Structure formats: structure tokens, C-alpha cells
């Protein structure tokens, strides 16, 4: 995929989910054939998000944590501080026009493999599942994934648990799976080394390498 354009990476810090969601929609609706593909790195304050396939019964208990009905794929998940969210705003249609063999499934696979490779940097064996998108360690889920495609362009992305309070996951069936256990990087390495600031550059670099982007701006 040597024809891919440079990838612009934006660090958004900590931002409200709905604010960034609206910005993603605006960006996608307004982009043209010359708009650079982008990655947005962000952490969200505590929020449950329901995907398009989400069912109300997967929220097991009402809490003070807000619930947002999102337009991404998938079911319910939780976002909180200490979780690295990476949104991918990629013009899939343009890459096909450039002659690159590029589709939604390949984008999903690249996201999952980027997480697998990032965790391998820490000596951790992780893997995707063909029947349940995301990344797992010993049957526990460490990364959730959901995309939306509009006008041939992707938005939304992945959420990788780094060093966070996992207890809100007990109030839901994560990604629609009853009893699914969640885990995080801090469970496997020195928690002092498990930070979004340390992990994000590795995650971006692996994603860019997998898809052949020729530059990143971090």
C-alpha cells in the first residue's frame, strides 16, 4: 500500500465523548478527496456507549454513568480515564481508487493487529477472535472495537484498556457478551509503566506500519 498518504495524528487529551463524536461526524461529512487521513487519540470521562446493534438488556444496572446511543458498530461498552481510545478517520474509497487492496475488513484486522503487536512489545501474547471483534488475553478482553463507514470513509475506532478502573464493566454485558471478563495492560506489567502516554506512540506506529502509511505526525 505504498500509495497511501501521510497519516496525521492528533492528541486530543481528555474530552467528552459526545463532543468528539460530533467532531468525527463533521470531519467525515466535510472531507473531500484531498483530505488527509487522521488518527485521533483521546481519553473519555466515564461513559457507556451503545453501538447500533446494542440492546437495552445488556445494561445490567442503572448507575450515575451516562449512557450514549452511538452510531458505531457493535454493542455496549465502557470508556473511562486510563483507557486509550484511537479513532481512525480513513478514506477507504480513495485508497481503492489509488489501486490499493483496501476494505473495511482489512482496516479492522489492521486495528486488531496493531494492538496485538503493541502488547507484544511488552512481552504479552494477545490475539483477535474471528467471531468477536477486539483483542483478548487468556479469554479476557483488553481492547474493544467498533467502526462506522460513511461516504466510503471510516470513523470511530478502538478502545484499549491501559490502567483504569474496570469496575464499571460489571454493570454491562461488554460488547453484548454475558460474563465476559475485561483486563488491562496494568494487570500484566508494572502499573507505573502502563500509561496512555507510553502506549499511544507504539500503537500508532504499528497501525501505520501495517497499512503502509509513509509518515505520521505525532
Swiss-Prot record:
Q: Where is this site: Lowers pKa of active site Cys?
A: 141
The record places the active site at 175 (acyl-thioester intermediate)
Location(s) in or outside the cell: Cytoplasm
- The principal location of this protein is cytoplasm
- Which pathway, metabolic or otherwise, does it act in? Protein modification; protein lipoylation via endogenous pathway; protein N(6)-(lipoyl)lysine from octanoyl-[acyl-carrier-protein]: step 1/2
Please give the function described in this protein's UniProt entry: Catalyzes the transfer of endogenously produced octanoic acid from octanoyl-acyl-carrier-protein onto the lipoyl domains of lipoate-dependent enzymes. Lipoyl-ACP can also act as a substrate although octanoyl-ACP is likely to be the physiological substrate.
Print the miscellaneous field.
In the reaction, the free carboxyl group of octanoic acid is attached via an amide linkage to the epsilon-amino group of a specific lysine residue of lipoyl domains of lipoate-dependent enzymes.
Q: Write the protein's name.
A: Octanoyltransferase
